[in-house]
């Protein structure tokens, strides 16, 4: 469907849980989070009702996120049932891949088409530091397993932080020359725990691109959040997601369902609608989703204000 600004909204990002098995420095506090009561998070059945309703309004792309979505007990069932909705053409997932190796075959059979893997360092000790305890070897094994069963292309999402991992930019770029792996460099955002790192840690996409004159621009769909490039010898693209230096609001095609059941028409807006109040009535749910999508804000003002208006943390929204 179209929002009131004429944008086609066909993409729903679904945060299935706010829990995670890592504690990345820009996302989650070191002590973790207080576990929410069961009544305060969406059940599997409620999530599916929202997905089904959204599909009736023209949504044909679903991405499951977290927290860490592989923690959800019924994630394979949710993917399978979503894949049976005829109008849904693409089902993807963003994961830290710690648990992916043992699950990826079943997830693919269930209908998962693609995975984005959050990976902010290729160095074992640094990865452990950024994630506060993660085992990078589990991630590498998950990538190898995913490639071996034909889950291609895999996209790696890397949040670049000055003085923390910006010395690995070339190493990440070179992955695209060796493997059918895309890399997405994401600008650090002043949201949640990222606020603490932003002043000293922010580095713009433009600064990175300017240092790599051999990058070749690739034609990009208007709704894409990334500017795409590649090297002459690349197997896949290198993307730059630049919410701070070059917002992509004019072509935005997405809304977000949080793990608490609120529908956010904009990642960086404080506006959201609690859908848990409507899931028992299919018509009321459909109407409320329709209304929320139609009233999606024209744009965010995070570039000007240097801060997200969203009160939620990234692990609640799913990015």
Curated annotation (Swiss-Prot):
Q: Name one Pfam family in it.
A: Mob_synth_C
What molecular function terms (GO) are annotated for this protein?
A: 4 iron, 4 sulfur cluster binding; cyclic pyranopterin monophosphate synthase activity; GTP 3',8'-cyclase activity; GTP binding; metal ion binding; S-adenosyl-L-methionine binding
User: What keywords is this UniProt entry annotated with?
Assistant: 4Fe-4S, GTP-binding, Iron, Iron-sulfur, Lyase, Metal-binding, Molybdenum cofactor biosynthesis, Nucleotide-binding, S-adenosyl-L-methionine
Pathway listed for it?
Cofactor biosynthesis; molybdopterin biosynthesis
Residues that, per the record, bind [4Fe-4S] cluster 2: 249, 252, 266
Q: Describe the location of the Radical SAM core domain by residue ranges.
A: 4-227
InterPro entries associated with the record: Aldolase_TIM, Elp3/MiaA/NifB-like_rSAM, MoaA, MoaA_NifB_PqqE_Fe-S-bd_CS, MoaA_twitch, MoCo_biosynth_MoaA/MoaC, rSAM
Query: Which PANTHER family does the record cross-reference, listed alphabetically?
Result: MOLYBDENUM COFACTOR BIOSYNTHESIS PROTEIN 1, MOLYBDOPTERIN COFACTOR SYNTHESIS PROTEIN A
Assembly notes = Monomer and homodimer.
Q: Please identify the protein, giving its name as recorded.
A: GTP 3',8-cyclase
Q: Which organism is it from?
A: Clostridium botulinum (strain Langeland / NCTC 10281 / Type F)
Q: What is the lineage of its organism?
A: Bacteria, Bacillati, Bacillota, Clostridia, Eubacteriales
């Amino acid at each position: 469907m179209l929002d009131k600004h004429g944008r086609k909204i066909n993409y729903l990002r679904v945060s299935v849980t706010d829990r995670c098995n890592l504690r990345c420095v820009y996302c989650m506090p070191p002590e973790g989070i207080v576990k929410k009561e069961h009544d305060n998070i969406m059940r599997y059945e409620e999530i599916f009702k929202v997905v089904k309703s959204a599909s009736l309004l023209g949504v044909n792309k679903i991405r499951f996120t977290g927290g860490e979505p592989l923690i959800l007990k019924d994630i394979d069932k949710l993917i399978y049932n979503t894949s049976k909705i005829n109008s849904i053409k693409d089902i993807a997932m963003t994961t830290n891949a710690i648990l992916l190796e043992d699950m990826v075959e079943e997830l693919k059979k269930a209908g998962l088409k693609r995975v984005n893997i959050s990976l902010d360092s290729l160095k074992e000790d640094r990865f452990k530091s950024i994630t506060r305890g993660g085992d990078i070897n589990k991630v590498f094994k998950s990538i190898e397993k995913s490639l071996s069963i034909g889950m291609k292309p895999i996209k790696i999402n890397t949040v670049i932080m000055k003085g923390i991992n910006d010395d690995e930019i070339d190493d990440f770029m070179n992955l695209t020359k060796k493997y059918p792996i895309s890399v997405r460099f994401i600008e650090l955002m002043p949201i949640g725990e990222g606020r603490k790192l932003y002043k000293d840690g922010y580095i713009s996409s433009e600064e990175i691109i300017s240092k790599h004159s051999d990058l070749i621009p690739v034609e990009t769909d208007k709704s894409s959040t990334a500017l795409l490039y590649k090297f002459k010898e690349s197997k896949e693209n290198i993307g730059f997601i630049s919410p701070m230096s070059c917002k992509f609001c004019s072509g935005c095609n997405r809304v977000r369902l949080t793990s608490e059941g609120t529908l956010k028409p904009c990642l960086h807006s404080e506006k959201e609608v609690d859908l848990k109040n409507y899931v028992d009535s299919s018509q009321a749910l459909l109407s409320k989703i329709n209304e929320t999508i139609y009233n999606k804000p024209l744009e965010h003002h995070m570039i000007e204000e240097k801060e997200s208006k969203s009160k939620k943390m990234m692990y609640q929204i799913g990015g």
